Amino acid sequence: VDYNTINVKISAGVHYKITDKLEASINTYFGSGTTVYTGADRYSLKNLKMAQHKFELKHKNWFVRAYTTQENAGDSYNSSALGAFLNEAYRPSSAWFPLYIGTFSEGRRLNGAAASDFTLHSAARASADAGRLIPGTARFDSAASIIKSTPIRRGGALFLDKSDLYAAEGQFNLSDMIGISDKLEIMVGTGWKQWAMNSQGTIFADTAQTIRVNEYGGYLQLKKKLGEAVTLTASGRYDKQTNFDGKFTPRVSAVFKVARENFLRVSYQTAYRFPTNQNQYISLVTGSGVLMGCLPEFQDYYKLNSTLPGYTAASVVSYRAGSIADSSRLVRAQYNEVKPETVRSYEVGYKGIIGKKLMVDGYVYYSEYKDFLVGVAVAQSRAGNKFELYSPFSSTNVSYTQNSADKVKSIGWGLGLEYNAVKKYVVYANVFSDQLRDV
């Protein structure tokens, strides 16, 4: 693995003023690099490339833009898989373990108690490891090169990710356009995105064809001033994604002027989070198990709801702590169709200037999540026999996303201070606290 980090970024743009109020622009951004990422496994992101191209028309009262993001995994590979396949390259596990066990057992038979377990283990390892690939040798480098250049779905470690994003969005200030900005501010907007996942089966379940996921939505915001003392804002947006029902999320807020340069704010907000594309479509075998999508079809593909059911991690740990015959400890994992995560949040805040020198900005909030998205780990036997779960060598760890049955809560507060001490010198201080409960 190359642990050096290289990052190259290039950008270019052309901006043209069509009129005094209308500007057109085209911008291009390109990045390339090499680094190491650690998640479920360790990944060598080598010669990774990413580009974004954007076209925009911008007016005082509106804008429309379209952009695309293109990515290429380059020569990236799963280093954990590389290590495992290198071990298999010189002698498969099906041959290594019998040779190790045979040598250890024969040593015990010939020497009895005169030979320690460590001595027998060393002899067995020496026998089973004979001919093992040694780093720095031509044989090792040749085998590693072949595995690095072979896609994961063909028994190698290479990622083939050339996924793209296409998007268009616009926003319009209707108040100025219809001449009522002094009475009511009206803002509307809309947007569309399409993700095109193309990993050729090395990350996502897209072996047959590119997976396309569409998301679209729109929003409306109204803002009204009641004299100089109160400003009210109300907004709502609707979003829909390919695999999930649409979500409507309203928000309201009020700002009160309690004194000159002193304001109190209160708000109620709702928001949502669709499962990510990775949550939905990943299909990746790692050194520690299988990462699979949360959509119902993955339960069918991996036979979790039929001949190879999954069992909860806690029950498997309990089973392995007892007798192999006591499979009654095992609890079958229940899969529920995943929903978007939603949150309701309440906030009270204050911002003001005290004594013309001290600016204070503080807030407290409370949030409650419903259908919180969490990772679930289950164990699956390899041949449908419960007793296989007693050993990690005859079972498979499987992980996917589910909604939590509990309501997760978040509570927090923050305080920021800015003090003009003497001419040209400003002192800043801030403190905050955030707690996530019932996760």
Where are these regions (language model features)?
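Transmembrane beta-barrel architecture of outer-membrane proteins
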Residues: 5-11, 48-52, 163-171, 213-219, ...
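Surface-exposed extracellular loop regions of Gram-negative outer-membrane beta-barrel proteins
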Residues: 7-51, 186-195, 209-257, 417-435
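Outer-membrane beta-barrel channels and translocator barrels
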Residues: 19-21, 31, 59-62, 175-181, ...
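Gram-negative outer-membrane beta-barrel transporters
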Residues: 28, 360-439
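Transmembrane beta-strands of outer-membrane beta-barrel pores
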Residues: 28-34, 59-61, 68-72, 192-198, ...
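Outer-membrane beta-barrel translocator domains and adjoining extracellular loop/strand segments
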Residues: 31, 36-43, 68-70, 75-83, ...
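Membrane-embedded beta-barrel scaffold of Gram-negative outer-membrane proteins
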Residues: 297-396
